Amino acid sequence: MLRTATILLCLTCALPAAAQRDSTARTIAIESVDISGRRPMKEIGVQRTELDTLVLRENITASLADALATGSTIFIKSYGRATLATASFRGTAPSHTQVTWNGMRINNPMLGMTDFSTIPSYFIDQASLLHGTSSVNETGGGLGGLVKLGTTPQVGEGFHAQYVQGIGSFATFDEFLHLTYGGARWSSSTRVLYSTSDNDFRFRNYNSKEFVTDDNGQIVGEYYPLQRNRNGGFRDLHVMQELYYTTRGGDRFSLAAWYLDSHRGLAMLTSDRNKSKQKKNTQDERTLRAVAGWERLRHGLKLGARAGYTYTDLRYLLKQAPEGKGRFVVNTD
């Protein structure tokens, strides 16, 4: 009886294993499948590159410049975090690159460029590149191309919250808060990003040579000093509010507002021998962007209208002692 039970138990364990081997080894031959689609008339001849949303959400400390450098072929010229970062397509300058946010151009009106270090990747839901003349369908003046940025309505009902924090070296802190609400008619999204850092790293200054003298004042040696980065701290605050409302008749109204408050120190020249902490070189920026829109899709016909507003207060400050006698003078624009 015991021998019979043992044999039955072994057969019971062996049958599933054999079935599993057969199922994994089984192959099914199917006929070829053709997948076809129609390209809209306005997309014919358009060279477009879509940026993966995973790249935009990869790192809280990343700006849009980092995301473009990682996920696209566009050339990004950057001097480090919280410093000027520009984008240019092949064979063109940064001023030839147009940038739109929800359909509104955000290029600097003075130089025509856009500082991508002031655009957090967490604030962008959709990003695409239109190369060369492909940008004429969206905006004009883009000899090199267009960087198209946008936000999308909240999908799903209910209230959701997301909080991400990052901590780095040299007293660097990043905090991101995202609050969303979705209902039958209304949807809302609130994003807040706050970044701050002392950015006082140590480096060997090869542009400043120190000499070692003996008791008689004769030079007996020399070395390159180890110094800290002065005046390189930054503080960035971003707040974005979005509201969407859909009527029963199919009309959708939207409002998106983005406020930026930035204070950035411009690092001193490595050849500057003035070590006084009173010397300052800073750039402050306060920018407000707002876009209101209306869309209607009915009977295969899409109508829409948008209105945008932008305001920028950019101030540069230089506090120095031009005579070298300790009398510091403030120069500002």
Predicted regions and their residues:
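N-terminal periplasmic "start-of-domain" segments of outer-membrane beta-barrel proteins
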Residues: I30-T61, T86, P94-T97, A127
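Outer-membrane beta-barrel channels and translocator barrels
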Residues: P94, Q154-G156, G183-W186, T246-G250, ...
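Transmembrane beta-strands of outer-membrane beta-barrel proteins
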Residues: F159-Y163, S188-V192, F253-L255, L301-A307
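Transmembrane beta-barrel wall of Gram-negative outer-membrane proteins
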Residues: S169-T196, S208-H263, R286-L288
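Flexible loop and strand-edge segments within Gram-negative outer membrane beta-barrel domains
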Residues: F201, R230-D236, T246, G250-H299, ...
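Short acidic/polar hinge/loop motifs at secondary-structure boundaries
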Residues: M104-G132
